Structures are given as C-alpha cells and as structure tokens.
C-alpha cells in the first residue's frame, strides 16, 4: 500500500510540474507577444515588405523579403553581381543559388520545403501557437534568456530564446539541410525598434550556418500591409 501511495504521489507531483512548466511557458509566450506589439496588432498583419543589406563572406549587397501571410515568402539578395532567391508558397518552393552552381531557378526538395515553410506564418510560431498545432515547452534558462522548445504540427523543432527583461526573441536554433548535409543554424536578433502600427522588429539578424559561414542582414525599412503582387512568388520558367 505504501508503494502504491508513493507511486500516486510521484505521479501527481510529476503532473503538477508538467502543468506548472506549461503555464510558465504560456506566461513567457504571452509576454513576448505583448512586447512585440500585442496579439491584436499581430492579427492585423497581412503582408510584410523588408528592404535591407546583407553581408556574407566579406561581401555586401542589397536584399529584400516580401511576405503575404500564408501565401508566399520570397527573399532576394545580390552579392558580387549574382542574384540569390529563396521562395516558399503554400504549395511548394523554389530557389536560385549560384553558389550551388545553379543558373536557373530550381524547385526546393520536399524535405527542405517542409523545414522552411513556417516562414509563411507572418506573425511567427509563438503567436496563437496552440491554434496552429504548435507545442511550446520551457526548457529552463540560459544566461539572460528563457529557453523554449517549439515543435510545429509537422514535428519540426526549433529552440527559441526569449530575453528575461525585454521579452524580445534574441536567438533561434534550428537544424537545416544545405548542400546535402544537415547543420545547426543559429539566428541572432538585435537592435529592436518600434515601427508601423506600433509593432517591434529586430533590425539586425545574424545567421550562422553550422559555423561554416555567417550572414548578417541589416534592415533599412519595414512596411506592413503594403500591396504585394502574389505573382512574385511564381517560379520563373527556365
């Protein structure tokens, strides 16, 4: 009987800890959403247009991102006279990558598309996460950040770091396939500023691809709900 009682007590304690962690994760997520503008404003974002510059391997050039929520995401950059494009839509994706020897746009492999299509979610994976089928678990703290494990409905996992003071997202760690190999991709966000509609965005994004090379994007301009022609997401014919 004592063993049964101990087992029940242990189960209740474990359940209580799990519930407490979930509640704490929700508190952190809610504070993050509020810090970047609040759920009401995030719900109003239909499109986002970003003008920026990108530095990679000592070279710099203009870049841009255009997003229509749930419809299409397209990032373009020009480095050393070469144009790089990655595009996701609700049906598939394509890319133009001269570094991989490509001279014409090519469809994204299914696995790469699955890993990256979350970029179609314009408000991000934490906003309204449960309704999207995402799961969030608090892993603890690392330095001055809360560490959250975010699992999408497609079972794609990322680790998000939320500053304990500002509640801005400071870093995201994910796995990605590039040129036939899987690597850890770390995105670091800084220089947060308030812009259109009172929304707050990071103006500097640094990405490390498995320590092999780094990419830094510095935002120049962000426009919310600007008209974006969906035709830009269609892969050009070779």
Model-inferred region functions:
Residues 64-65, 83-85, 135, 157-161, ...:
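Short, surface-exposed charged micro-motifs
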Residues 67-69, 88, 138-141, 162, ...:
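Generic beta-strand structural signal
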Residues 144-234:
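Gly/Pro-enriched, hydrophobic low-complexity segments
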